[in-house]
């Protein structure tokens, strides 16, 4: 200045950049429906010999409520106090306008050393998803938190509990004139699931598995039954995830593919039913939740041909060729 005195200020703020690794997620799971995560930032004076005070209040926190705008799940902390990311653009904002930036140095010019820790992960229903709640009704254990030493990188490994669903298929085979089945149609089932998104709306249905009872297997079942023209089997779906990564229950439904069942009518219903008890129309049974394996089926499907063609007609005709004055 005019008096020849230079003033050096050490108030240049620092940006702490971190990265989140999500592993073992279901294929194609959207970033917008990932859980809310809160990070805590602690600091100490470099070279002071002091330990980080993880039992005390952090210098800053960051809550990410929308991961869709964060490329490679990279985020930043810019302010002391609460930092928030809650839009699809990944913008960091302070909780209040008067929050200062993160200092790089102390007032004495000593360098601060920062460390980042993940403090909590919560689902769309507000429950902790890392098993930190006080009871099974107050938390879900869906993620393992793995913090990588000496970096601002945290990994969450998804591991939903799994269960099974099974479908009972009853197929009535119509006989032809020779008292043998006209055909042995193959049977195919598709298993779909949905969950409640972070916005409170159901997700689009996702095809999870397909199970087939082949024509050869249907014929083998018929030959094992002897005189009966009604055959049945149970098809199972195992290792089905019970929860989506945001903590919402996966709700499954099974649908019969009627591509191979021309001329057959279909009835279905929830539960392990006998043929005479399957009275519901359609070809889909929903509202299914995976569970531990058991003998009873979760849904029953019945196929039968109401009317079998027993009378046939013969068509005859004559073909006339015009062959260019008998040249051929």
Which residue stretches match the model-derived regions?
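Solvent-exposed loop/turn and edge beta-strand elements of beta-rich ligand-binding domains
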Residues: 1-328
């Amino acid at each position: 200045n005019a008096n020849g005195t230079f003033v050096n200020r050490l108030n240049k703020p620092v940006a702490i950049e971190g990265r989140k690794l999500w592993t073992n997620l279901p294929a194609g799971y959207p970033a917008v429906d990932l859980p809310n995560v809160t990070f805590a930032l602690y600091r100490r004076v470099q070279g002071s010999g002091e330990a980080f005070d993880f039992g005390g209040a952090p210098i800053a926190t960051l809550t990410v409520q929308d991961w869709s705008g964060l490329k490679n799940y990279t985020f930043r902390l810019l302010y002391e106090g609460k930092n928030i990311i809650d839009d699809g653009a990944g913008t960091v904002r302070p909780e209040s306008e008067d929050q200062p930036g993160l200092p790089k140095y102390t007032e004495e010019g000593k360098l601060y050393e920062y460390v980042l820790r993940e403090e909590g992960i919560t689902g769309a229903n507000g429950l902790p998803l890392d098993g930190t709640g006080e009871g099974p009704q107050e938390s879900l254990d869906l993620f393992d938190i793995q913090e990588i030493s000496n970096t601002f990188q945290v990994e969450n490994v998804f591991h939903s509990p799994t269960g099974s669903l099974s479908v009972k298929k009853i197929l009535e085979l119509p006989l032809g004139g020779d008292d043998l089945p006209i055909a042995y149609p193959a049977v195919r089932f598709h298993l779909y699931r949905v969950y409640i998104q972070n916005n409170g709306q159901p997700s689009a249905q996702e095809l999870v598995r397909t199970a087939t009872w082949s024509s050869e297997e249907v014929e083998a079942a018929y030959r094992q039954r002897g005189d009966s023209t009604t055959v049945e089997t149970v098809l199972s779906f195992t290792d089905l995830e019970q929860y989506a990564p945001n903590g919402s229950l996966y709700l499954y439904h099974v649908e019969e593919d009627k591509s191979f069942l021309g001329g057959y009518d279909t009835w279905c219903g929830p539960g392990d039913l006998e043929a005479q008890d399957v009275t519901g129309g359609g070809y889909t049974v929903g509202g299914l939740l995976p569970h531990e394996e058991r003998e009873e089926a979760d849904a029953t499907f019945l196929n039968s041909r109401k009317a079998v063609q027993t009378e046939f007609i013969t068509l005859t005709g004559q073909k006339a060729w015009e062959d260019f004055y008998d040249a051929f």
